[in-house]
């Protein structure tokens, strides 16, 4: 059972899930933000992958993504930063990102790196369900990634 299922099956009364955009406010602060959130009782963290056109997000997340990109955040850097995160953090980590940067990185490579870093799930708001079923589900399932 993955960490997300364990959390929701734990009979915990108060579950707190927090979103933040990787690379914001500083490029090198992502791991520290994750550590600090867990230390202060957050149950699950949604790590935003910055994108230049976050169409489904409000102005606050748009601005955070813009700042993160200005700071130099990319998927390559994010995966490098998180490669040892499971030595320090045990709560579920979920990526939220748009399809474009994931496709530029390569969907299978993205899934492989998620597994290497211990990412528990991925939210891709602009991935149509039918496209997921037809093209990406088999890859995600091969790596055990919950999309």
List PLM regions with ranges.
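Active-site mouth loops of central-metabolism enzymes
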Residues: 16-30, 94-106
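Residue-level detector of anion-binding/catalytic polar loops
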Residues: 43-44, 92, 120, 146
